[in-house]
């Protein structure tokens, strides 16, 4: 039986290795810990290079991590070979000062072309520090193809 989506064929470590090709992924230090259908979890450590004045994590860094996490939760769905962010809204609830930081997205609605994801970002003390809601446009397999094509 063929796999219905891209990531069950890859382990978390293989996904992390694949994403090392993206400079921002490396700069932030993101590492995925879990990939399941409609869910992912990533972590990254505190780094002063990622902070703004006042020693708190820059909002753009949080936004990027949230976008990565949501994107890979979407890619775990049946027959999804790729997805792009159509809309992403974030509420910053508390300053993120202590790591490691965790980001957890969950797919809450799946249509043929649009997927909505609820995303939470936590600091090292498990405080909910940011809440996001995003929509991804998905590209699904239309035949037996199981790899992303260039």
From Swiss-Prot:
Its EC number is 3.1.2.-. Pfam families: 4HBT. Keywords: Hydrolase. It is an enzyme of class 3 (hydrolase). The keyword Hydrolase applies. Belongs to the thioesterase PaaI family. This is Putative esterase SSO1253.
């Amino acid at each position: 039986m063929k796999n219905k989506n891209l990531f069950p064929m890859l382990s978390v470590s293989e996904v992390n290795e694949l994403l090392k090709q993206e400079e921002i992924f490396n700069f932030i230090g993101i590492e995925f810990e879990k990939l399941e259908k409609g869910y992912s979890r990533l972590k990254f450590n505190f780094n002063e290079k990622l902070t703004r004045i006042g020693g708190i994590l820059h909002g753009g860094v949080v936004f990027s991590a949230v976008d990565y996490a949501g994107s890979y939760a979407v890619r775990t769905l049946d027959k999804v070979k790729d997805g792009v962010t159509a809309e992403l809204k974030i509420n910053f609830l508390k300053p993120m000062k202590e790591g490691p930081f965790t980001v957890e997205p969950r797919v809450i609605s799946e249509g043929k072309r649009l997927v909505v994801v609820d995303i939470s970002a936590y600091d090292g003390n498990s405080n909910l520090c940011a809440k996001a809601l995003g929509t991804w446009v998905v590209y699904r397999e239309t035949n037996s193809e199981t790899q992303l094509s260039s």
